[in-house]
């Protein structure tokens, strides 16, 4: 199977080490961080789940049936990996929950535990997710000393804030479908599928821009015409190549950004524009899809710094612990450390 991420540059060079990820679900543990408290009352039942080997949408649909509501009445802040142990909240719009016995739900769904139940006055939305805590265990790791040396670099300078391979689908099928939709001017009422392919299209172009900056030596070095963001994701208007700006970038106060393509003109100028525009021009079908859906241009930081990064190694097993903000991918951190050996998995039909 081809690795779709091999299209993009490594910040620290292609790893020499190899290893296996998610050999077992408990080798990839994710805990959601919402960043706010629930009111304790309201029309939405908030259910905290721990799921193993199940995807979020399947559990949400099953929970809707159990609560006697439609699937559209169950929502979440973020979708979580299937082949993992993940904790997250689901909100269920249901008036009366006194008769619900969640022990019965657990008995018929062995891959799901109900950890906590409360109420809130609003349903969960994707924007509610602040981030996630991760524990990632890699097994059968070779060249462990090289991995440990790379971890020191990651802790100091971060990794490229690439979108992970899951955004692009199996062997890039989501990107290929997005191209077809743009080329054939496909129209649909399926907002979920439309959003899916638009995200793949914009992510693909973004990754290529970041990859070129690495290749040309501009990953942590601003160029004229760059657009910077502060820690609150606000655009900062200042001399981006000044010593002061460079120092703030190194301190993490400011971030260099790359384009999430839209139907409006790129706001970058000068050298920054020459690093971005060719990648939009190289994908006319993806841009046709983006423009046809009137997506507006956005910016995304090109560097990703995992918070509270710690690690331990025992034999050929590596354990990583870290937190990431919403929208970032744990797999792009591991990508800088080792080449993943594919693990064959068998799934049930709960897709």
Curated annotation (Swiss-Prot):
Coiled coil: none annotated. One of its GO terms (biological process) is tRNA pseudouridine synthesis. The keyword ATP-binding does not apply. It catalyses: uridine(13) in tRNA = pseudouridine(13) in tRNA. Belongs to the pseudouridine synthase TruD family. HAMAP family: TruD. This is tRNA pseudouridine synthase D. It comes from Aliivibrio fischeri (strain ATCC 700601 / ES114) (Vibrio fischeri).
